[in-house]
């Protein structure tokens, strides 16, 4: 969030880095050599919130991919509901079943020839928010979450059949 404008965007390049301490990574491709609003806001504020997209909120979340100027909010455009965070100043999105409040650990410019091609962000999760309906005995119910992944372009994917394989001892 910058100057009272809450920025949002769907990113497919997001992953777990560590469970202890809980850390995640995000990668932001530059457009014509320019940083995206989201990464610029993360680097300046040193805080951000990551949400898990699910089958119920994916259409609204997709609207946040709109190419808006920095003074316009993708969150407002998508009619998503901001909710106050506990440990960071950046609000979260009420419609997400899981959200992670994060502090910036590292930012790294990568790739490109004359200018960087992307930024890699590593954030420490300082607060988890998980809906009670999908959380039991320290585990998230993947069926209840109904997570959706962003692939590329206009493509998203639902999680298919879930199966279990015992780990060797």
Per-region residue spans from a language model:
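Basic, polyanion-binding surface patches
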Residues: 1-169
């Amino acid at each position: 969030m910058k100057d009272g404008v809450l920025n949002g965007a769907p990113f497919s390049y997001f992953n777990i880095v560590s469970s202890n301490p809980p850390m995640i990574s995000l990668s932001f491709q530059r457009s014509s050599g320019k940083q995206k609003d989201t990464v610029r806001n993360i680097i300046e504020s040193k805080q951000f919130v990551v949400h898990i997209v699910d089958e119920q909120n994916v259409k609204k979340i997709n609207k946040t991919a709109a190419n808006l100027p920095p003074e316009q909010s993708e969150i407002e455009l998508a009619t998503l509901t901001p909710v106050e965070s506990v440990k960071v100043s950046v609000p979260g999105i009420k419609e997400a079943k899981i959200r992670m409040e994060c502090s910036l650990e590292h930012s790294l410019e990568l790739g490109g020839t004359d200018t960087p091609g992307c930024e890699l962000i590593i954030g420490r999760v300082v607060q988890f928010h998980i809906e009670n309906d999908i959380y039991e005995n320290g585990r998230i119910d993947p069926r209840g979450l109904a997570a959706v992944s962003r692939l590329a372009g206009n493509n998203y994917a639902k999680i298919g059949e879930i199966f279990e394989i015992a780990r060797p001892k």
